[in-house]
Amino acid sequence: MKFGQSENPQHIDFRLPTDDPHTAEILKQNDTGKPMNVYVGCDKWNKNDLKNFYPRGTKDELSYYSRQFNSIELNATFYSMPSRQQVITWRDKAPNGFRFFPKVTQSISHMRRLNDVQMLTDEYCDNISNFEDKLGMVFLQLHDNFKYKNFDRLVSFIENFPKAIPLAVELRNTEWFNNTAVSNEVYELFEKHQVTNIVVDTAGRRDLLHMRLTTPKAFIRYVGANNPQSDRERLDDWINRFKIWVELGLRDIYFLFTKISNWNRPFFPPISLKE
């Protein structure tokens, strides 16, 4: 079974938990005079993954996709180091206002597991920077067996990551969530370096729904259960939570859908989150 999935999602309590108290403190520090930025997208633009999404005869999928949504979780950068030219090609196909959220290459996160990765990280960031103003936020997704014993590697990676490039991190191992002292150490690190703590809403790992923001930005990865009723209710729940966070000071929302097996336009309209 793939990470975060459940054999019986119909038995999962999908209600959002209450916020960590520190989330309100983080949001209240934000400048409420800033305009709202809401970015909604998927984890792929391939027509084989977004069934029923593209009109018949669509040839340039990214060009069409980027005019329906304003962001994308870019997984292609996870599987191989992106070249400068590839980044420029992607960038130039998307309109102004679109944002790419590229995942850190697996050679850094999964193969070397953040050990001795400075040269690779520099190469990655040099190439990714060619997204220019269409770069949303780079995100580091660590393997679910990356544990607290490797915390020093995470510290080093964050301390040496270019400050000009916004960074988010998704932790997966249960140790990061079931030990308060460990969790607090991570959150302090993230807050110190302005690293966004990704919240994952997935059926099989409700502990990833920690509701603990470390920057005044909400980066949500929503894993669909592909049940129209429960997914609709979950999305409504998120919209209500965002309303609370906006009142507290939230001005940046990144909401990325993943594992949506059959696209239904009326079901996940991007405008629903913007409203």
Where are these regions (language model features)?
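Residues lining hydrophobic/aromatic ligand-binding pockets adjacent to catalytic sites
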Residues: M1-E275
